[in-house]
């Protein structure tokens, strides 16, 4: 399994250019946070990595490398990169139980799909009574439960990398904290490389090792999390950090 995945000069276009020459490097055991405002190109960059661009959007330049060798996004999805989606309610088939979802995920990747394996993954993400959870349909579960189930399926993939696209969006404060605890636990136990897409600098401060800031389809600043919080350079980065510090009655040094 690869130890590093590199996005090199990725460019995306629809009716007009959307992402301009984005380069990112994911490393096993480290969390790279991709931050920026809505419409900055964060989720599109993730979609390009996985080969799931929306209709009408195409990649016009760039490549993806695994340990320095060019690789197709389709060869990465699921096997080498697991995904935690932004909206879990739309990610599950409403006609299938959690057992069907989890089992099909395992079978598609050639992983064990026995009930003991599925139960262990569900228990690992803190969902109680795994036997009952496996019988549930998506509409019978809360947003927080569905997000945990999605993380359980990422655990089942045993992929060396994870893309987590706004994993705490639309969750209440308690559910958000639990999801962050889970992601932190996964990093400690499995040490995958993680691309964490978020607009929440509190999430960045807690989980990230490195940060890349996007604005208008470009990476405008990139560095380790400590440097970025203590000495942000770009106006977009300074605005994000200042807004975060203001929540605690603090100000960014001029």
Swiss-Prot record:
One of its GO terms (molecular function) is nickel cation binding. NCBIfam families: nickel_nikD. It comes from the Bacteria. Its main location: membrane. This is Nickel import ATP-binding protein NikD. The complex is composed of two ATP-binding proteins (NikD and NikE), two transmembrane proteins (NikB and NikC) and a solute-binding protein (NikA). It comes from Shigella flexneri serotype 5b (strain 8401). Gene3D superfamilies: P-loop containing nucleotide triphosphate hydrolases. It is an enzyme of class 7 (translocase). Its EC number is 7.2.2.11. Residues 2-241 form the ABC transporter domain. The gene is nikD. Part of the ABC transporter complex NikABCDE involved in nickel import. Responsible for energy coupling to the transport system. Keywords: ATP-binding, Cell inner membrane, Cell membrane, Ion transport, Membrane, Nickel, Nickel transport, Nucleotide-binding, Translocase, Transport.
């Amino acid at each position: 399994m690869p130890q590093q995945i590199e996005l090199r000069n990725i460019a995306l276009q629809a009716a007009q250019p959307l992402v301009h020459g984005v380069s990112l490097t994911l490393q096993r055991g480290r969390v790279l946070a991709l931050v920026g405002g809505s419409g900055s190109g964060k989720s599109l960059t993730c979609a390009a990595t996985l080969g799931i661009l929306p209709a009408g959007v195409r990649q016009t330049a760039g490549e993806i490398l695994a340990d320095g060798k060019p690789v197709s996004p389709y060869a990465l999805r699921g096997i080498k990169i697991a995904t935690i989606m932004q909206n879990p309610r739309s990610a599950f088939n409403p006609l299938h139980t959690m057992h069907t979802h989890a089992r099909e995920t395992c079978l598609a990747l050639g992983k064990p799909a026995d009930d003991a394996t599925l139960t262990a993954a569900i228990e690992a993400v803190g969902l109680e009574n795994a036997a009952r959870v496996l019988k549930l349909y998506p509409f019978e579960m809360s947003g927080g439960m569905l997000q945990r189930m999605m993380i359980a399926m990422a655990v089942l993939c045993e992929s060396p990398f994870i893309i987590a696209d706004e994993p705490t969006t639309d969750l209440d404060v308690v559910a958000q904290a639990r999801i962050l605890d889970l992601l932190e636990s996964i990093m400690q136990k499995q040490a995958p490389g993680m691309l964490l897409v978020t607009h929440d600098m509190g999430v960045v401060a807690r989980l990230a090792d490195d940060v890349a800031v996007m604005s208008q389809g470009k990476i405008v600043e990139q560095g380790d999390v400590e440097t970025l919080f203590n000495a942000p350079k770009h106006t977009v980065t300074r605005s994000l950090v200042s807004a975060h510090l203001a929540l605690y009655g603090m100000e960014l040094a001029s």
